[in-house]
Amino acid sequence: MSQSLIIVGAGLAGWTTAREFRKLDTTTPVFLVTADSGDFYAKPSLSNAFAQGRLPAQLVSTPAAKMAETLNVTLLAHTRVEAIDTAARTLNVRSAAGLQSLAYRDLVLATGAQAIRVPVQGDAADAVMSINSLDDFAVFHARLQAGAQTPGRPQRQVLIMGAGLIGCEFANDLAQAGVRVRVVDPGLRPLAALLPPEASAALQKALEALGVQFDFDCTVRAVDHAAGRLQVTLATGETVPADAVLSAVGLRADTALAQAAGLLVDRAIVVNTYLQTSAAHIYALGDCAQYASAPSLLSMHGSTLPYVMPIMSAARALAATLAGSPTALVFSLMPVSVKTPALPLVVAA
């Protein structure tokens, strides 16, 4: 039986687990499999880069090769996991080199979450973007730069679908960068899931002072091409020109691999207090995990916690367990910083 630890996913959860594990175990072979380049960057920086004038490449804090060398990890970048055999403790992965099988002692799923896609009509519906990775940000950045370089074009304009955490952060960032921002949300106030009404009202006022326009109790009906730009039709019938349409309506745990392997999945991959899934020797953490350590009134399987601090706590506990010291995950009160410089906020998760 293989003695290797395999981590699937090179986001904060995957790399932090590798780093914490290496503090405790310097000899066990570690493989990290990722569909992207594996470069390490702070995902929260994606929603405050425009105002700082930072280019996509400047958001990478450590190249993947350097991370792998520092942590003595075998990196399999641009490689997709096609299947997991829980009985044989193997996974099939495919890269440009072809298909290969990897055996594991323990497997960690850090597959993250995927942006929720809201169906809209129109011939430019596929132009609606979500920013859930550095690659997504690079495409969005290029689109706005193209608009800025077009002679005679008016001020760049972005329509954001969703007034939640990510929507408000991007609205603040883009407005500070000189972009005209309009936010459309079916609810009645910004950050309704995290803030009481008084705080929501204060945030709305602060963002409006930057020029952000809100359309509450409203949705996007269609997105069409129009004279080199996009034309957004709201449910009210109003049409709004835009250089880009950004969907920020939320994330859904990426559970496809886990479901195909027969693991227990609810809103995310269900894990116990030791972060073990329903299969022996397979663990999960990060945005793809549903933690028994975070009780919920909505599910007997606990809660998802798609924030930075829970990931750090989970990675430390899991690393200890993987290194031979079973450690139950205990969450303390963890603040969530809302990156809206117009009105800086910290919310208890």
For each of these PLM feature ranges, what is it?
Residues 2, 288-349:
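Mid-to-C-terminal Rossmann-like scaffold of FAD/NAD(P)H-dependent oxidoreductases
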Residues 2-73, 172-194:
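Beta1-alpha1 glycine-rich phosphate/pyrophosphate-binding loop at the start
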Residues 8, 102-112, 240-250, 315:
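Short hydrophobic core segments
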Residues 60, 155-159, 165-222, 310, ...:
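Rossmann-like dinucleotide-binding cores of NAD(P)H-dependent redox enzymes
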Residues 70-85, 208-220:
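A conserved beta-strand/loop element that lines the FAD pocket in flavoprotein oxidoreductases
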Residues 85-101, 224-239:
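Conserved beta-strand-loop-beta-strand element in the redox core of flavoprotein oxidoreductases
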Residues 111-177:
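Glycine-rich dinucleotide-binding loop and its adjacent helix/turn
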Residues 126-148, 233, 238-313:
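FAD-site-proximal beta/loop scaffold in flavoenzymes
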